[in-house]
Amino acid sequence: MNISIRNGMMAAGLALACAAAIPAAAKGTLVYCSEGSPEGFQPQFFTTGTTFDAVSVPMFNRLVEFETGTTNIIPGLAESWTASADGKVYTFKLRKNVKFHSNANFKPSRDFNADDVLFSWNRMADDNHPFHKLTAGQTFAYFEDMGMKNIVDKVEKVDDYTVRFTLKRPEAPFLADMAMDFASILSMEYFETMMKRGTPNSADVYPIGTGAFEFGSYQKDAIIRYKAFDKYWNGRPKIDNLVYAITRDATARYAKLKTGECQVMAFPKPADLDEMKKDPALAIQQKEGLNIGYIAFNVEKKPFDNKLVRQALNLATNKDAILKAVYQGNGQVAKNPIPPILWSYNNAVQDYPYDPAKAKQLLTQAGFPNGFELELWYLPVTRPYNPDGKRMAELIQADWEKIGVKAKLVTYEWAEYRKRAKGGEHQAIMFGWSGDNGDPDNFFVPLLGCEAVKGGGNNARWCNKQFEDLVIKAAQTPKQADRAKLYEQAQVVFKEEAPWITVAHSIRFDPLRKEVQGYKMDATAHHYFNNVDLAKTP
C-alpha cells in the first residue's frame, strides 16, 4: 500500500528509493525505527500501540491530553472544563485559532470548533450517522470495547467553542478516557468535502488532524514520512521532518541505530541492552511498564470453557523461566491483570505456582487424562510487554508437552493476527496491553469486560457477571479508595476463573542516539517527538 498527500499514490520509483535506504539524519530530520506497520490511518478504528504511534500521536489531538511521561491530564483542544456535582455533566471550553492540516485534495476553510467535536463523537456513537459505516469492515473497536454507548447519553454544542457531554451514569475515569487515542478529533469539513467529491473513504485513508506533524507519504512495511506542521497550535516542532523506518526485526533496528540510520528505536531485545549501555553514542531511557503480557483462552471454544483446564495450563506454565529467557529478568512475573505500579493492585492474590503434577491432576479431573491438542497463537512483532513472542511460545509449548498438551504454534502478519483474533478464531492466543490512561478501568473493561467480547478486545471472550458488576460499580464510585476495594475483589474473581495466564509485566527501554535532545519516555508506551531536537554535528 503506497499513499501520498501529493497525488493520492506514491510513484513507484520514489517508493523504492525510500525503502532502499534512509540516510543518516539530515538537518532537521529524525528517523524512528518502528516495529511494524499501522493497521490504517484512522485513530478511531484501531487499538494497537503500533497504529497509535503512527497516527494519533503525531497527527491528532484530543480535548484533553496526558502530560508526556505521566498520566496527568492537561488541556488539549479544550482549554478548560468543569464537571457537575453529580459527575454526570462535563462542559469543555474549546481552544480557538486551532488549524487543521491540509493536503492536495483539501484546504480547510475554518478553524477547529465544536462541530468537529460533535462529528468525531457522533460518528462513533450513532449507528445512523452518515459516516458511521463509511469504511466497509471497520468498526470503532476501542469505543465499543469500553462500552461508551452505555456511558455517554449525548453530546451538545453550547456554542462554537463550548461542548457539553451528558453521561448516563457517573464515570470516574471519564476524563482520562477522553485523553485516549480513540477520542482524537477529526475535521468534519474534510469528511463532508470528500463526500461531496464522491470519494468519502479517502478521508479515512489520508489523515487530516490538528497535531504537530502532517502526513507525507506511506509505503506499507517500509516507511512513513511526516513533516512539521507550521501552524501547530502548541508551537511548531523543532525538527522539520519525521520518518518512521518500519523495521520488524529488533536486531535490524539495533543495527540501524548503531550506524545512525535511525536516531530512536522501538522495543530492543533484552539481550542487547548490556551492549547498548556500553556504546558511548547511545543513551538508554527506561521506565517500569504500565503493562501486562498474557495468554488468553477462548472460553467459547472447548475445552477452554472448562475452568479446570484453564487452571491446569496456568499451573503447567513456568513463568519464572519465561521471565529469565524472554525478558532477561527485565520485569516481573505477573499474577494480576493489572501491573503492581497501578493503584488497586491486589498483592494478596495468590498466583498459580509452577506445578505440572497438580496440572495433570486437574486435566484428569476435567476429563483429559491424556491431554489434548490445540493451537497457540504467538505474537509476530515485538511489543513493549513482550520482546520475543516466538521464544515465549516455544517455552510454553515445551511446558505443556509435559502434561500431555500438544500445542501447534501459529502466527500471522500483525494486521491479520489482530483481525483473526477480533473474530475469535483462536483457541489460545498470546497478547498483552500497555495502559492508556493510568486508571485500572483501562485494563479491566477493554480487555475483560462483556462489551469487549462484542468489540473484539476481550481475547478470552470471557463475560463473567460477578466480575462485570464489580468493575462497573467501581467506575461509578467517586472515591478512589472505595474503587480500589472493588477492583481488588474483581482480581480475586479473575484469578479463580483463570481466563488468562498472566505472564509478565516488563520494564520498558527506549534506546536513542545521544544527539537526540528533549526526548521523554511516555507512560503509556507511545513515542512522542513534538519537543525533540537534534544536536548539531560538528
Describe the residue ranges of each PLM region.
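A structural "hinge/loop" feature
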Residues: S37-D53, L77, A104-K107, A172-S184, ...
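A bilobed periplasmic-binding-protein/Venus flytrap-type ligand-binding module shared by bacterial periplasmic
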Residues: E67, K227-D230, G289-A312, A316, ...
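Detector for C-terminal structural segments
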Residues: T29-S34, T51-A54, A172-P173, Q219, ...
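N-terminal lobe/hinge region of extracytoplasmic solute-binding protein
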Residues: C33-D86, N122, H129, I208-T210
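Surface-exposed binding/hinge segments that line
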Residues: R6, K93, A125-F191
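Structural transition elements
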Residues: V333-A366, R383-R391
